[in-house]
Structures are given as structure tokens and as C-alpha cells.
Regions:
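Cytosolic regulatory regions of ion transport systems
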Residues: 1-170
Length: 170
């Protein structure tokens, strides 16, 4: 049950935190940990701000998605996972029997609409493609989804998210 904060971005400055470093609101944290522990962090981000989150749409079927889906369904949440790769969908079907798994492309607006993105309480984008994560998160925010958590690897995109007012990304 651990993770490491590797770097902290504050404005245009980057810090490698030590034991005395103090994190302040607005800092961008770069963390590393096991898939299981990162899943726990995302679950905490979902439940921290919105205690009434009951339905979640996950975009992407990675190992983190499997851990997160199982944690969320075990706590009584309704979870829909959209994954493009059929093989990954098969793993999700096998390991996450309480979730609804959809084999499809999340960049397809009609699929998101068909699967009820406008009715969920939270959207978590966990694909390997920053641009898909970014666009789906921006779209879900624009239609009123209460909580959006976005996986972003590219530092420039994470700065953009901050400037656009998105609070939660990993």
C-alpha cells in the first residue's frame, strides 16, 4: 500500500520532494506505484470529492482499470468500462464480473452517448493515449459529468488541464 511522489510541478518549477517538502493545492504530482496502489489512489480521488458517486464510466481496460473496477464494484458502485481491444475486454469480462464491459472506441461520440456518459456521476479515462483521455474528459466535463479523472503522461497536456480548471488527473 505505497506509492512514491517522484516529482512535483508548481507553476513552471519542478521539485523532487524530500521528507520536508510540503504539497500545496494546485501542485501537480507525478507518482509511481503498483497498478493496485494506483487504482486505490484513483478510487480515493473519486470518493474524496463526491460522496454520492454511484455510477462510473471507465475508459480503457488496463490492469489499473481491472483493480479499480473491482474496488468500485465491491463498494456497490455501478461501473461501465469501454475498451477498444477485444483481448483486454475478455480479461475484463473474466476478472470483473460485476461490471458492464463494452468493446468499442471511446473516441466515438455516438458510443459514449449510447452507453450513457451523460448519466454517470464520474468518468475516469485510463487509456494509453493522452489525446483520447484528454478529449473524453473535456467532453464529459462539458456535458455536466460531476467528477472527471484523467490519466495523462505528457507534461504539456497536464498543464493544459490545470489551466482549463480540471482538478483530477493521474
Amino acid at each position: 500500500n505505497s506509492f512514491i511522489i517522484c516529482a512535483v510541478c508548481r507553476g513552471d518549477d519542478v521539485f523532487i520532494p524530500n521528507g520536508d517538502f510540503i504539497i500545496i493545492p494546485g501542485d501537480i504530482l507525478h507518482i509511481t506505484g503498483s497498478h493496485h496502489d494506483l487504482g486505490k489512489i484513483v478510487k480515493e480521488l473519486i470518493s474524496k470529492k463526491s460522496t454520492n458517486v454511484k455510477s462510473i464510466m471507465l475508459i480503457g481496460g488496463s490492469r489499473i482499470s481491472i483493480y479499480l473496477t473491482n474496488m468500485l464494484t465491491a463498494s456497490g458502485k455501478d461501473v461501465v468500462v469501454i475498451e477498444k481491444n477485444k483481448r483486454n475486454c475478455d480479461k475484463l469480462y473474466e476478472h470483473c464480473p460485476k461490471a458492464t464491459v463494452i468493446n468499442g472506441d471511446a473516441s466515438d461520440y455516438s458510443l459514449l452517448a449510447e452507453e450513457g456518459i451523460d448519466k454517470v456521476d464520474a468518468v475516469v479515462t485510463l487509456t494509453d493515449t493522452d489525446e483520447v483521455n484528454f478529449l473524453v474528459s473535456m467532453y464529459s466535463e462539458s456535458i455536466g459529468v460531476k467528477k472527471n479523472i484523467t490519466k495523462i503522461n505528457n507534461q504539456n497536456l497536464s498543464r493544459m488541464l490545470t489551466k482549463m480548471g480540471m482538478e483530477s488527473y493521474v
